[in-house]
Each structure stands twice: as structure tokens, then as C-alpha cells.
Amino acid sequence: LPYHRVLDGIEEEAKSDTDLDAGTTGRGIGPTYEDKAGRRGVRVGDLLDPAVLRERLEYAVPQKRALAEEVYGLDTGEEFDVDALFEEYRAFGERIAEEGMAVNCGEFLADRVDGDAGVLFEGAQGTSLDIDHGVYPYVTSSNPTAGGAATGTGVGPAVVGDGEVVGVVKAYLSRVGTGPLPTELDGDLAEF
């Protein structure tokens, strides 16, 4: 949601001169995962029922607005307006319903696996950025390892490992944001 991006920027700015500065893409992923873990996130299924959507927004948005205004001292706009968010995301929910785009992901994938259909999971980033196994605190908010495919899709871990798992490894580490970069060269070697 729009307030996730705003909060991401606010928090990164607040941490910019500290050891807590992890550097982000600014897309609001961290605050979104905070809401998921806090069980206050708005999920795709919530968009399909206007009453549920409004209830979720009325619960979460005032907390986010208070954080931005009272903790960080900022003025907030439509990104923190329950009515504006409700209208925008209710329309998204209507479109999702009309076009049949929402499915139970675990069930959808299990049907394909049981039907011998090939299933391909694609991830990004890597172990060094994994929230549990990466170079903390310079990590993303998710699990971008092969095990994360099971966590994020609803299929069992045996499904991911039962077929073939192909890992792609770069010859060097790269990253978005700040944090250690073990393969980084300094001095004259860095100028090649």
C-alpha cells in the first residue's frame, strides 16, 4: 500500500547516519512484511470483500498515520487516508474478482503438481540477503533461498525438493543498499 513506501523512506532517512542503515529499494517491502508478521496486513483476498477491506484499513491506517505524524513529525496525505485507500483498492478488488485473478495459491499449485504439470519457481537475491541466514541487518525482509519457495507459495517443502532445484550463482556478490560486500576491491584494483 502507498503508506508502506512512505514509511520505508522515512525509516531509511532516520537510520541513514547510523549503523542500522541497511539501504532499501524504497518500495515499502520492509513495512509490508512488518504488517504481515503483525497480522495487520491487507491481503489480496481482503480486496474481494469491501467490508473486510474497510475493516482492515480502519485498523491499520491510523497506526501508520500516527507513526508518521507523531513519531517522525511529518504531515501525511492520501497515502494515509482510509477513505481514499478504500476507494482505490475496492476498485482493484472488483477487477480481480471480475477477471477471476484470485486463487488459493497452495491449492492451485498442488493441483498442477499432482497433475504432473511442470511448476517453476523463480526467486531473486540470495542467501546473503535472507532475513534468517543473511548478513544481518543488511538483509531483505523475505527468504530468497530455495526453501523460501515453499514458505511463499503454500506448497510443501518436499514439493520444492522432490523435483530439481537449480541454483544460479554469480561469480561475484552484488547488493542493493549498504552493507558488507566481501568481493569489493579497494584501491588501484577497484579502478580496473
Where are each of the predicted segments found?
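Non-transmembrane, aqueous-exposed alpha-helical and coiled segments at domain scale
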Residues: L1-F192
